[in-house]
């Protein structure tokens, strides 16, 4: 029996050779491989396949998956494929062909009476996003991020304190303890960074032992060469990452001074273009060094006609500046440069900038990391055309490059890729389902540790789940003991070894960070280009390997107003 491609796609989702448009962008992906078997597809529903003795076997719970996501289109750094995905004990157990092995050939994911089904037909499945630049200013950020498709948040803070409004530091053991205890309340993987600004090791060591998974160097606390050197030395000793916001005013040295203080050691440079802070005007040079793991924050993603004006206002508020003081205004204006922001777009498209994060409520929007990543990809396709690595008539490589910026690469950078960051067997089942028309903007379903934590949901008093008002609501994995079983709190190996989780009475599952200190830019997937960057100190023009980097600001963007009328 044969059916048309259109009929097949309507029933089981796209298959090899079919193309899917991502939201209202000009980005098209093409299915590279289909792990399901034609004629043996499984689908749930009345008169469908997953019924007793048909697609559902007699196997016991230990032999079947807890949940199967059927016929999903996976977009991940490793491929764009159609598959069934099996989840077991909170992790991804298999990617392949689901069904009843007693009556169906080639089954790699057994379905039984103990299996739940999530219909992935016509849906896109991605790993949950990882945001590594979080100012924990208010707890409401966490729900906002979760509903956007982010499932891991890394950063620091203590609430709306003046220090937290500007810097991602949970300063000291007492604050770390309180924030780790608070993390138990949220269906989100959370890791905290301590304050890294000190010239002697002991104040930093005690924070790592208190649970910090990294240390943050910020110019507002004094990012001097001495503090940089000391912080990296402690990080090397305890296998935690260092994130840095460098010296915008060049008070304690220039970009070359800071790069020298790194001494070749691994470091995550925040907002490496500089509008979010850093050596003016040439911190962008840092993206050309193998030990530097560069990221952007999302307000400059992508460069638009509103970017410059918006940033000046943001900066005055976030860094406690006074518009009536000439020196404060000059400080703000030195950080916001059209030329370097335009270059940042292109450096992302070339794979020289490796990650995108938010800078939540501190010159960044916590719910827009994913949207702005894909807006940047779309802008670059329109302005620069297909990438040389893309296939005929598709944007598959570009899609893999950009999705890696907020999934696997932040995970590698911060030593958590053994747990999260991709749709791969063995990883924690933090997964997001999207309708293609809403991809990157409004997810349909967010899973944490294999259970549904958030979803679009209609009127709870309706006779079916879909009547309006439809909006995002927490689901059962956001409550009670289920929350503790399906979300992770990341801590340092030193804190785990000392029994910190037990001492603090932490309830969520605990995971440790590891392998942070030997990461190089070449380890960051699809985003490992090391250009030689030159910035003209007068015009701010940026060249990479001698080529001028300039693009016009966007007048309009996809994934914008038309999605937020309701």
Curated annotation (Swiss-Prot):
Coiled-coil residue spans: none
One GO BP: urea catabolic process
Subunit structure: Heterotrimer of UreA (gamma), UreB (beta) and UreC (alpha) subunits. Three heterotrimers associate to form the active enzyme.
Urease domain segment(s): 128-566
Listed cofactors: Ni cation
Compartmental location: Cytoplasm
UniProt-recorded Gene Ontology molecular function terms: nickel cation binding; urease activity
UniProt-recorded name of the protein: Urease subunit alpha
Active site: 319
E.C. no: 3.5.1.5
PTM description: Carboxylation allows a single lysine to coordinate two nickel ions.
Binding site for Ni(2+) 2: 216, 245, 271
Known catalytic reactions: urea + 2 H2O + H(+) = hydrogencarbonate + 2 NH4(+)
Organism: Pseudomonas fluorescens (strain Pf0-1)
